[in-house]
Structure formats: C-alpha cells, structure tokens
C-alpha cells in the first residue's frame, strides 16, 4: 500500500498560512483534539464544534489513513495488542460492500498499521458479511449505520461511537441522505440538552474527493474553518481524449483494451492491470466474451494473455472465482490458453466492473482505466409512479472518481471513450436519488423525523430538513399512497401518523406498500410467511419472474418445472399441470411463492438426509430447475429480513403458519389464494388497472395505459401490479414503454372498488345515486394550479362535510374497503379515503393541479393559487411548453377552461360553467365546438382570452383573464 498524501507535508489547502506545510493528518487530528473536552477543548455548543468536512482527492488516504489516525485519538498506537480495547468505536461508512470489506482487510494486513489487527481493533460490518471487534475501528456500509440510527436512541448511539466518518459523502443515495438527516437531528437534540448531552456527542467527519463543500457546510450550518482541503494522488494520470465519440462503447472498450495490451507488452505484471467500467451486468458479460475472443487472437499471435475478471455486487457477495482473482496477487494467477488448453501466467488482469469499483477500492497493480461514461440507475416518474433502470451519461464527479482509481502507487492512464467536449457538457454532480427516484421506502422515516421537530406533532412538508427535499410531485404521490394504505391521516392540524403508520415507521426498510401488505395479512388471517415470501420475490426478481432464471433465452415456459416443485401435493398429478396451475392462480406473485417453496423443500430434504455440502447440492438443484442460485439465496435472505422486521416491532412473524398456501388441500386452496390476492390488492390498490375493450389496453385511475397479454388468461378485466416499469423499446434508441412488473388477476378473487379505479374522465360518475342528471346534476370539478416555493405543499379543496353535499351525491363506501379492514384505523380516514377517490396530483416541473369538488367560488381561498375550471383528463394533451406559458400567464384572477366536448356532455358542462361564472344566460342548446364560439361567451361574461389550444375536434383549452 503506497504512502498517502495525508502523511506527506505540504498538501493542505483552505488552512491558515502557517499550517500549509504541515502534515495533513497531524493538522486534522490537532484540529479535532482542540474541540474535544478530554483534550482541553470547550464543551460543544453548536454543530461547528462537531462537524468537519474534508475534501481530499482520490489517493490521499482519506479512506485508510484518516480512520486509523482518528481511532488512535481513542487508543494509543503503542498499546499492546493483547490489551482489549473497551472504549467507544469509530465507524467509517462506505457506500458499497466491496469497499467496506476490502478496506478493513487491507488495513488489518498492512505493515503501516501494526496496531490494527483484523477482528481485534479493526473489522467490517455489512449486511451479508461481518468480521468485527465489539469495539474498535469498524468499516460498515451506510445501511448498517442508518439502521442503527433508525432503531437506537441518541444515547445508545453516543455510547457506541465516538466518531462517525461518512466516507464518499458526495454519494446521494436515499439511505445516505436520510442518514445525514438523522445525524444532524441527533446532534441538534444532544446539543439542546446542554452539557449533559454535549459531553458524549459523537464527532462527525464527512470525506469525499468531489463533495460540494458549500452545499454540505450550509446544510450543517458550519463555516469555512470547518472545511479542510487535501491534495490527492502523488502520481500523475494522463488522460487520452479520443478525437471522436463512439456509437458502440462495448466494442470500442474491447478494442481500446486490446490496443493498450499490445502497445504495452513490456509492462511489469505488478503495474499492468486494466479496469473497464460498464453500466450493467449484461454489458459486462458481452464485453467479457469479446475480451476472451481477443485472447484467442493473442494466443494465435503468441502474445501474452489477459485474465478477464467480471466483477459486480453478486460476485462480491458470493466471493466467486472472479472476486478471488481480484484479491489475489498477480503472480499467483493463471489463465488457460484457448489454443493449447494449457495454463500460463497472464501479463495483466482486465477487470470489467460496475460502479462497485468506483469508490474506495484500491488495486495497487492498476495502471489503466477505460471509461465509456455511462451510469445506470433507477428513475421514477410521478404521479404515474412508473420507474425503471435508465442509462444516462455519468456526472463529472463520478468520472473523476473512476479516473482516481489509478495514479496511487505509480503513474496511470485514463481512457475516456468520449471527447473532451462531451465531458464538459455533462453535469458536474450526480442528481440525488431523492430527485430521480422520489422518497420511496424512506418516506415514513422522513415523516417521523420531521414530526419530531414539530411542536404540534404533525407532518409539514416545508419542515423537511434534508440536503435536497423530495420533489413536489413525488411527495404528493407518497402522501397519497400513505393515506390510501391507512398509514397517514389528515387531522385538524395537518397530516398525522395513524396507529398503523406508527408501527410501519418502526420498520427499517419496508416500503409503504410492503408494510400495508403485512398488516392486511394479519387482518385477513393469511400466513405471514407467505406474505414475506411474495414481497421478497418482488424485491429480488425486480421486473418479472423470468429474472430468476439462469438462462440467456428466458421465457415463461422455463418456469414450469420450478413452479411445480413447490405446489401442494393434491395438484401435482393433474394433466397439463403448469398450464392449469397458471390458469388457476392467475398470478405471477403466487407462482413466485411456489418457486421459493420448491427451493425450501430442497433445503429441508438435503438437511434431513444429512448430505455433505448442502450449498453444492442446492446449486445443482437450481441448475436442474434453470434457476439462479444467487437469486434464490437473496430471496431467502430478504424474506428472513422481513420476518425479523415484524418480530422487532412486536408482530408475530409466524402468524397463521398452518394456513400456508403450499400446505393447502382441495377444500382450502382457493380460499387461501383469494386471501393472498386480497392482501396484494390492498397494498397496491393504486396500481389497479381495468381492461378497456375499445382501446385494447389496460388503464388506471392516474391516466396511464399499457398493453398486457397472457397466453393462457385472455384479457382479464381487472389486474393489480406492484409497480409500473419503464422498459426500453430497443437498444438503439432512448425510447421506453410502460409495462407491469408482476400481474395478479383480481377477476373472481377480490371484490374490487370500481369507484376507486374510475379514470379521470369518469370522475363525475363517481358521485353515485344520480339517476336524473337534469334534476340533480353532479357537482362541477374545481381545479387549482399552485405555484410552489421550495417544498411548500398542501392538499387543495375542502372536506366533504364542508361541501354541503346531498346524501345521494356521497360516494358509496364498499364493504371491503380500507376502513373495514383494520378496526383501529381512526374514523377520519373515511373522509381522507373519499377525497383520494377524486383527488390526484398531476405535475410538470413545479406545477401541480388537484381535482376536488366545490359549491361556490367564494368558498375556496388558497394562497398563491389560480382558480381553474374544467375536465382535467384533457390536460394530458398539454405539452410542457403549454404549461410553461400558463405558468407565466395565469394570475389569481385567471381561468383555464379545459373541456372535453364529447357528445352528450355539453349540457352538463354548460350548467357547470354558468354556475361557476354566475352567468345564467348561456344557451344550453348551443353546440360549442370551436374556440371562437367559446371566446364569444366568455367575452360576454367579462373575460379576455390570453391563451388557447384545440388539439382535436372535441377538446380545447382556453385561458381567460378577468
């Protein structure tokens, strides 16, 4: 391990002039000690006394030397190793398992740190892998510390850790943002307790090579004196910019690696390795194949061979052959000659990796990095709540991290596969996941942490204290989902957690829908182990069950043998077993349940028969069933985590164990199927879709639609899916289509609330009980367009009790809906549930409109709002440019008329219009189908048209100003 610049004098910046030539690590340790009471420092009174930001370039030792020297503040390095350390620990978080494990092992084996012994004074703690002392320097994934902050009290955290080092703090994963929110809140609470809390308050150090120091210092309220800049690598890195961009980065990466290999044939094996970044495993496999083919050409030319090592998170978790090859010394590795089949020494390793190798990982033999410049991450689009893996150009900060993998021990070379001009055009920093994905599974944690700071005990969006708050549309969608799931309710003072919400908020990582599905399982007397299995399958299989198959050519027919391995005994001897099971279940998730049951049966069989090496036999079983062994193990682990989560909050994870679907008989099977489907429906009711026979598409209440076809089940009328996925139409073009992830057919199994699923254009019909529209017309729809400042958010509209509605206009509340499922839900959830039936957010950038009912124009008063009238379904035809125009044109006295003038609706909308405008002379027999005709009417009412658009014969948009 090379000597980092933190240990070399003269690399400090942003420090007093007299300290610029200090050894950086000495200056940092002195700076910290000056603020510790045990070293003569004052008792901390503000965050500035407990937060330090170190921006240290790659290769400086911020991940290795810094944590060790910080730990030595607590334990003298000359202390005998046999003396057990009993003080508080230092935790250093890493964004990935690989870096946490590797750093701990490297430090434990380094001659530079003889006092750091793996398992005694240094260790690692990750979800899949753990080897750590009870007290000492602990490298952990961010998720480990996040879970502790979520479940432990402030005093418990303070008694465990003296220092928290957040390495790679620039990473903007949801968990890291939430962790920083927790840390800041904890520090503030302990400081508010005075000297009692402040004496043991942990010291927080944020480190990164590309951190935005201004943003983070502003967030923590600290000044420039709390920011230390350190120069990075000691050796130069030469960047080889290409003259032209490539349209096939995988092929170009292979050609570049081969060129490097041939032109540097005299490299020493200890200074020769190549690292190539790829956005995903599919690209890694393809590039590895090309490189292995290149090895064939090298063998024919009698040139030294390359050892190809594909690395991703799965390889690390399994510690497979490729990962072991990465950790081994090059002199101990061999490669098979494709011509002679003999093994020989490779000249170099070519490591083909995802972003797991992007940060914190030091490969001392690495000399070259090839970067195609792409990054793949999940993006979610609201309010449709559709998401998927999207490949985009990596931010400059990520590219700098990739470049920083070399130049640590000797000079390195960086080969971008894009021009310098392209690099200069891409964003400097990556977008935080809370922007690209929304709050997701951490939403309830955000709610709880925000409520803690609110004296009234309510959730207010403007009080969210995060580096970047959730976007308005994502926040609106999350609130809607939480209300529908019965976890949030709207009290007199604002949004509050329900009793179920309070329980759900204690889960460390369950989403709103996952928590709701578990709660429904207890109410409907379902086997909770089945619920946990279904949720685990959804999590691991991601888009569809075929992702569990270990085959390049995946299709549903290949699942047959795996599904049949787990079905109840009474179904095993029927003809056309899989086809009939598929028809009987009509459910991807239940088929996934049976796949896992088969895997469990295999585990029990091998254990009961006392076979040697159970894992080996399970791998062979999975190969026969064409299943990925790693995926099945992940389902097992995820399922165990869910059951543990339930047990931790006091719920019985083995509730109704005897009612498992796999143990059903002919009399109980369909009843248990219906029960599980009911739980799925209640969890994912916002993702219910009805079949439109005219359009041959499935449509939902949020206006989106998609096609779905099943070879056996023909066009079911109602389906539910855990999520809507964005799937690429082709590999050549940046185009995506919507498709369901997993499908559960509800027809005949669940009593679906059709009112809840009504599309927007049918909203007036939700007001059931109106037989004679002329005598008792439905109330018109009032729409509000809000301009949001920062994170200000509130639901528009009045409660149903305030709307003076006639009894016949109230929505019929079905017997099987939310309020009847869990008896302890507060009764005001009924009102909220009713409002959600007709309240949905639709936004473009900072614009949002909300649908609700109204009686008189004067009844509705909203700050920063513009009153709009019309049918919002037609607003789908407005472009972003149209909305931008409205954003600037509309004032508090402006109106947007959005009318869908299909035949038979004119009378209803004219009636609504004359009520809204107080103008009772509009002729109801007129056929208004053109913009000029409408303009004439509104001019008579004293309005001036300022914007208009007519996308079709029956749809038009007009903005009027009074």
Swiss-Prot record:
Annotated Helicase C-terminal domain residues: 253-459
EC assignment: 3.6.4.13
GO CC field: host cell membrane; membrane; virion component
Domain of life: Viruses
Factors inducing expression: Expressed in the late phase of the viral replicative cycle.
Subcellular location: Host membrane; Virion
Keyword annotations from UniProtKB, A to Z: ATP-binding, Helicase, Host membrane, Hydrolase, Late protein, Membrane, Nucleotide-binding, Transmembrane, Transmembrane helix, Virion
Short motif (DEAH box): ranges: 167-170
Membrane topology: Single-pass membrane protein
Family to which this protein belongs: Belongs to the DEAD box helicase family. DEAH subfamily.
Protein name as catalogued: Putative RNA helicase B962L
Species this chain originates from: African swine fever virus (strain Badajoz 1971 Vero-adapted)
